């Protein structure tokens, strides 16, 4: 007997032959990447700009060390965030919480002119939020399809198009606003779009039905064998992704030292 498609009836509605939920994830990820790469585009420039230019006047070496440490932790925390989502939070709750923390983080960076501690608080919130957000939104994409669905590769291609579009727009707009108008405006714009992405996902998540909800013992016992096979395949995919992230972290740490 063919396994019933995951989620609700809404999930079975398609756009360009893909579940409509894919495009909710597409835009959520796009705005998150907008904020991430937009902030990264001006981080070192802000730190190395003179105090007269509203920067901190750091040496480039020191700024790059902070940048490297931040980037390394951004790749490390998804290992923890994926486990928390699997065991406790569920993928959707992890995505919402992670997006909220990142929106707060960008907002805190925008307040660096008031107090320098806001800057470091912002980086910390971004690291934690990314750990919850990044691995779990990708997992939801995989769960929109059966394990053997030929459309899954195309779905990830569409999803990564959102990543590229967000990165391009973030670097362009946040970079321009930060350099030409004010650094805090660049950080603030990143926060605005991250907050927008969070709201979009939060209010549209009903379209996913039961996909990505908080795990329970009851729901685990009631799953069919086909669902178990799908979950196993998804778990294997996540393990491969985490192994890749771990390799990146190791090389990033080696770069720092």
Outline where the language-model segments fall.
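Glycine-rich segments within core transmembrane alpha-helices of 12-TM secondary carriers
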Residues: 74, 151-179, 186-197
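Intracellular juxtamembrane helix-capping segments at the cytosolic ends
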Residues: 132-146
């Amino acid at each position: 007997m063919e396994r019933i498609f995951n989620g609700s009836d809404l999930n079975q509605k398609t756009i360009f032959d893909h579940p409509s939920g894919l495009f909710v994830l597409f835009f959520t990820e796009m705005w998150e990447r907008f904020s991430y790469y937009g902030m990264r585009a001006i981080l070192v420039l802000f730190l190395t700009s003179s105090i007269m230019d509203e920067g901190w006047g750091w040496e480039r070496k020191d700024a790059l060390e902070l940048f490297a440490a931040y980037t390394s932790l951004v790749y490390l925390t998804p290992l923890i965030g994926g486990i928390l989502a699997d065991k406790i939070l569920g993928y959707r709750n992890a995505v919402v919480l992670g997006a909220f923390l990142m929106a707060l983080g960008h907002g805190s960076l925008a307040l660096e002119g008031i107090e320098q501690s806001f800057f470091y608080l912002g980086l910390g919130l971004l690291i934690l939020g990314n750990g919850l957000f990044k691995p779990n939104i990708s997992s939801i994409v995989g769960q929109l399809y059966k394990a053997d669905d030929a459309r899954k590769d195309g779905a990830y291609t569409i999803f990564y198009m959102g990543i590229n579009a967000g990165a391009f727009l973030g670097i362009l707009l946040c970079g321009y606003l930060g350099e030409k108008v004010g650094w805090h405006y660049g950080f603030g714009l990143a926060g605005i779009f991250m907050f927008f992405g969070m709201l979009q996902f939060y209010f549209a998540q009903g379209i996913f039905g039961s996909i990505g909800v908080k795990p329970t013992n009851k729901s685990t016992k009631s799953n069919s064998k086909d669902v178990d096979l799908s979950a196993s395949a998804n778990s294997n995919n996540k393990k491969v992704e985490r192994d890749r992230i771990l390799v990146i972290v190791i090389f990033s740490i080696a770069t720092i030292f």
